[in-house]
């Protein structure tokens, strides 16, 4: 009788169906728990990329304004990064709050020196809070930085939407 119990099956070559179902169920539970966290990390990285792209463009303008060899006229410059439009056109725009087109050209030259492909930068995140509440609450379709250049080369930056300013974790004010 003991010999019968000591005999091993030689045809046991794999897992049983029950074992496979249990493993699949455990994997499904893990995916269900981890997927929302993964999506949060992906969105956070998209926002980080957007904030970094805009911040680098702002720094290019600030450095150009503070540089004694270059001349960035006293003015207010706005850099806006929009969502990718369906036509595939450039989505980053520099505007100047004056009637002098020369100021815009100088700002664009400053950006081109720092980042040659700045005009092709696209908004990666679709979840920037527009700051609106109630029925008008929606996600912002752009992020922007308004850079005011003083006569001495000092700069003040205002970020839009407000959630971008807290994401970059600063309200930049630098001087010469």
What is the predicted function of each stretch?
Residues 71-74, 85, 92-100, 106-113:
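N-terminal amphipathic/basic membrane-interacting segments and domains
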Residues 83-90, 112-117, 121-176:
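Short, surface-exposed interaction loops/tails
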Residues 6, 32-35, 44-47:
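Short, conserved catalytic or interaction motifs in soluble domains
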Residues 12-38:
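N-terminal single-pass transmembrane signal-anchor helix
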Residues 59-81:
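Alpha-helix exit/C-cap motif
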Residues 39-56:
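Aliphatic-rich helix starts adjacent to a transmembrane/signal segment
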Residues 1-15:
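N-terminal leader/signal peptides at the extreme start of proteins
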